[in-house]
Amino acid sequence: MPSAIKGVMVQCDPSIKALILKIDSERHDIVIEELDETHLVIDSNKVQAVKNELNRLLSKNIYNPFDEQ
């Protein structure tokens, strides 16, 4: 019997897609399908977790000159 997974299509640039794929490589339960270089279908129940993890990863890569003072 076929089963279906409710998904959300995400459009992003290739660098963000790479981060989402990195997050998925640790859990293997987020990405349902890679459509092309800028589109993914992800599990609709994991959208908020992906947003939180992306924000965490991106905040580590932001340069703030005031942090050095």
UniProtKB/Swiss-Prot annotation:
Gene Ontology BP annotations: nucleotide-excision repair, preincision complex assembly; transcription initiation at RNA polymerase II promoter
Location in the cell: Nucleus
One GO cellular component, as annotated: transcription factor TFIIH core complex
Alphabetical list of SMART domains matching this protein: Tbf5
Keyword annotations from UniProtKB, A to Z: DNA damage, DNA repair, Nucleus, Transcription, Transcription regulation
Pfam families: Tfb5
Biological role: Component of the general transcription and DNA repair factor IIH (TFIIH) core complex, which is involved in general and transcription-coupled nucleotide excision repair (NER) of damaged DNA and, when complexed to TFIIK, in RNA transcription by RNA polymerase II. In NER, TFIIH acts by opening DNA around the lesion to allow the excision of the damaged oligonucleotide and its replacement by a new DNA fragment. In transcription, TFIIH has an essential role in transcription initiation.
Assembly, per entry: Component of the 7-subunit TFIIH core complex composed of XPB/SSL2, XPD/RAD3, SSL1, TFB1, TFB2, TFB4 and TFB5, which is active in NER. The core complex associates with the 3-subunit CTD-kinase module TFIIK composed of CCL1, KIN28 and TFB3 to form the 10-subunit holoenzyme (holo-TFIIH) active in transcription.
Family of the protein in this entry: Belongs to the TFB5 family.
Name of protein: General transcription and DNA repair factor IIH subunit TFB5
Primary gene name: TFB5
